[in-house]
Amino acid sequence: MQQGYQLDDRPYGRPEQLDYPQTGPSPGAVPGRYGTPSDQLQLNAAQSVDNLSRNSPFADPHQRGPYQTDYAVNPEAHHDAYYNQPYEPTPMEGTPLGYDPGQPGYDHDDLRPMLPHQDSHASEPYQDQPTPQGAGGGIKRWKTVKQVLLYRGNLVLDCPVPPRLLNQLPHGERDEFTHMRYSAATCDPDHFYEENFTLRQRLFSKPRHTELFIVVTMYNEDEILFARSMIGVFKNIEYMCNRKESKTWGKDAWKKIVVCVVSDGRSKINPRTRALLAGMGVYQEGIAKQQVNGKDVTSHIYEYTTQVGMRIEKGVVQLVPKQQPVQILFCLKEKNQKKINSHRWFFSAFGRVLDPNICVLLDAGTKPGGNSIYHLWKAFDLEPMCAGACGEIKAMLGTGGKNLLNPLIATQNFEYKMSNILDKPLESAFGFISVLPGAFSAYRYVALQNDKKGQGPLEKYFAGETLHGSDAGIFESNMYLAEDRILCFELVTKRNCHWILQYVKSATGETDVPDTVTELVLQRRRWLNGSFFAAIYAIAHFYQFFRSDHSFLRKVMLFIEFIFHTINMVFAWFAVGNFFLVFSILTKSLGGDELLGRTGEILGVVFTWLYGVALFTCFVLSMGNRPSGSRWYYTTMVYFWAIIMVYLMFAAIFIAVKAIMADVNDGTPFSLGELFRNPVFYTLIVSVMSTYGIWFLASFLMFDPWHMFTSFVQYMLLTPTYINILNVYAFCNTHDISWGTKGDDQAEKLPSVSTKDGSGKTDLPDESDLNAQYERELTAFGSKPIKVVHTPTEAQRAEAQMDYYRGVRSITVLAWMITNFGLAAVVLSAAGLDRIDPKHQTAEEEDPNARANIYMTVVLWSVAGLAAFKFIGAMWFLVVRMFRGV
């Protein structure tokens, strides 16, 4: 146990009972469960449900009444449950009550206040005005107009949770369980701290240290996807609370963990997901405000320590009693401003207030394993210079692997597995992982910070949010398509630092993968373009490795890895051309007299024409059609490319078998060495089987070979789809830098709060409505959405930006097409190149396929060599992992 942390709840106080609306003790209160004095959290309510006698100007604000009467949630007794005292996050000068941290009594004084208040009294406590009963039925409604005191214009409300929920909760005597805190942020996330906003963890009498800060970002995901992620997070928190022998974790580990849910746009959040948050006690309808003191609210922040768990039964989310508390911070952004802005709220606003040790990033729908977050944290604990880590992303295969029946899911499963078996371990062995996936990764907060000049990883990470078209270069304007890759590069190359990145095999996260062609095309457009521009960025800034404080050996290793990534990028650039060359060489070879003869020549011509038509169709559809509107075209092309791949595999096997038979029947004694000297067998079989053999061997050594049996064939058949359809669509849409969502969506208009001399009036729902709000969610507001009128200058700026990106797109596609066409023409001696050089014509007459065969040999063996390099790195990763433990 760390010195100064009190892990027992209220060891020196008397157990308190909640005054529930029914007689008898609360069914949610746990007898003998006490509250820790350091966990005392005074409400921001001068006229609150807490000891109304203390609302007098002559009352001692530091004196607590009897525990049995601390709270009353009877709506007939108190209509001013929402009244809030001024929000003053500035701690008092000096040490409260004369105690210094570490001295006896620092953690054990029940009378020590949370924060001092200079003025807690309002001139007009409340006035209740009954309003006509609504059409909904017999619920007594009150329009409660309250006097609200603001601190420097900040509106903060402590709202009691619905009694129906409160009756189910243990620890009901503590404020963090009985009240939900709402803050109306009216500033940019970068100014959240300077505007004197704070969070609950800093307001306890002894502020809580945040060891793990977990963010779940969402847009319009349904309640199933959201619950899937939250169930995984809750299981991890429970796992850490059960580690009773740990120096960091233990019974009260939940106090060191904060779960932040950031929803991108109030008008975009799924109503069922919002209702689920309300069921957990985190969200309440009717609290949010549109403006505060003339300032537009940018984010609605709800804080609550929930004890409500959930499970998914037959496709329905069910709330269940949860004994393990979880501190939840729900940030509902007013506008849809993309995921990178959600991360800016997480890092720049909330992270600066809480100053966490480790930050974990999750996408809604990604379910971490039961102890995966702990294993991520452990990697940082074991390696002080670890700046970032990621786990294994798994494709969600369904019960019994039923989703593998879909070839697209099986192909992505194979792709994910091989990346986690070869690519990630190799990069981890060098210390630089090119991308830590935002769906499931973790960072050390201190490593992310910028320097005194404001330059650093976070500055680069958020740069793309404010860049505009022609005002920026090609690298900067496309940076945020690969912001996670840029962040990884900036961390490892951070000036005067020697941070490294690690892959943690023990940490896993399951995620849904696209199950239709159109969804896959749209997803990979951003992925491929992001990785392409990130690779260009890394190549253009490779020298920044040398500004870091890494050792000479580490810099050499990073330089080798940089060369490896450069070679991979070259192969990715020429992937379309290389695939066509292999296709052309093999189909022409089948026309030989010793193979299929005239039949092979006819098949070669037919398939070549079909190949050209399909590739041309890909370009036409990619330049203007939406994939969702061309679904049948894309599906047809997937089947066609699969047929092409079957034909290629047949050609390779048939040619190799014929070559072996020729060696056997040539009249000389057959030997294995002679077989390997056969150029056809050596080029086709040995090189290709070396690549596939390395895949099998590495999978078995990682004790994860099943994808080789369930997904390998599907991956082989859909390889041409990845090369032609996905690459073509991605390059033809490099001008589209969107995430698939539009910004500046207008939500329903909310009430506003205006102030004068630091106080003002606002309408708040009466406590008698809480149960009704808890049972149902409002679906509409009376006022219409606010229409944004764009000035001509803004429209011209947006059009200029799109023109710039279209120009970048045109240049990129032209360069890509010309270079790939040129490669094919040179290798195949086509497009009239054979008539330019007379010497070349003579060589072509002797062996027309010599150049093509040499090139195919180089390509196939290069692929095998890259696979072998990955295998060596993966084996080194396994050796290090044996000693490291995670």
Swiss-Prot record:
Glycosylation sites: N51, N196
GO biological process: ascospore wall assembly; chitin biosynthetic process; septum digestion after cytokinesis
Segments of skewed composition (Basic and acidic residues): 7-17, 106-122
Keyword Cell wall biogenesis/degradation on entry: yes
A GO cellular component entry from the record: cell septum
Subcellular location field: Cell membrane
Keyword annotations: Cell membrane, Cell wall biogenesis/degradation, Glycoprotein, Glycosyltransferase, Membrane, Transferase, Transmembrane, Transmembrane helix
Catalytic activity: [(1->4)-N-acetyl-beta-D-glucosaminyl](n) + UDP-N-acetyl-alpha-D-glucosamine = [(1->4)-N-acetyl-beta-D-glucosaminyl](n+1) + UDP + H(+)
Region (Disordered) residue spans: 1-70, 86-138, 745-768
Enzyme Commission code: 2.4.1.16
GO MF annotation, one: chitin synthase activity
Annotated TM spans: 428-448, 526-546, 556-576, 602-622, 637-657, 683-703, 712-732, 813-833, 858-878
PANTHER family on file: CHITIN SYNTHASE (PTHR22914), CHITIN SYNTHASE 1 (PTHR22914:SF9)
UniProt name for this protein: Chitin synthase 3
Organism: Verticillium dahliae (strain VdLs.17 / ATCC MYA-4575 / FGSC 10137)
Gene that specifies this protein: CHS3
